[in-house]
Amino acid sequence: MNLSLHDLYIGYDDDASRYVVAEALNASLTGGVMACLVGANGIGKSTLMRTLSGFQSALKGEVCIDGCALEGYTPRELSERVGVVLTEREAMPDLTVEEVVAIGRMPYTNFWGTLTQADRQAVDEALLLVGIGHLRHKKIGHVSDGERQKAMIAKALAQQTDIILLDEPTAFLDYGSKVSVMRLLRQLAHEQGKAILLSTHDLEIAFQTADELWILQHEGLQTGTLDALEQHGAVSAFLAKSGLRYEAEQRRIVFV
């Protein structure tokens, strides 16, 4: 499974005007890889994630899955290929964790949303994979932020897509929960062969866990491994704008 961007322009378009957030973006993500999208506030990370998810139309260029543009898929076909986890809290506090995860099976259920044995098995496996099987009967509104985020990841896993996109999955979590979620996502990419792209502001954790980095700046999008990007000066240039420096030997970020 391959997700690719080809000369992609993202932003907003209406009858009166067009606002380009970022332009001429090119990148590719394959199965078994966890990539972290990083960039300054307001640079367009969420807009890019929404465009890759098909929630927002591109102004120009293409987003492709296995060489086919998103527009070539029906909504159902797209939901069978791409799972999405957004930052916003979903308005369903009275549903149990298990019921929330089961929503991930909607692309496969009948008109009435009836779960088959195979659907229930997919839900069970997703709950166990993220380590929250013991919370299945607890209301989603009564669990911690970290547990809730794991439930959202389990919902995406129950959807059984090859690509998972997550917008700020570690936002609002304490440090331990941030590390736990990032390790979980990397494990899922490596062991389940998922292509995982997540946006984050947690640079140090991203640098330590990501297989690849997508650095979004006004100059464009640069992608690659941390070491490769550092060798080309991309990491240093990116961090310098915020008064930071990357120390490669210690693999840490420090204030200048």
Model-derived features: where do they sit?
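Catalytic Walker B motif of ABC-type/P-loop ATPase nucleotide-binding domains
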Residues: 164-167
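Conserved ABC transporter NBD signature motif
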Residues: 61-69, 78
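ABC ATPase nucleotide-binding domains
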Residues: 239-256
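The feature captures the beta-strand-to-loop junction immediately N-terminal to the Walker
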Residues: 38-40
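Helix-to-loop junction immediately C-terminal to a conserved catalytic motif
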Residues: 53
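Conserved ABC ATPase "signature" region
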Residues: 102, 117-135
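H-loop/switch region of ABC-family ATPase nucleotide-binding domains
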Residues: 200-201
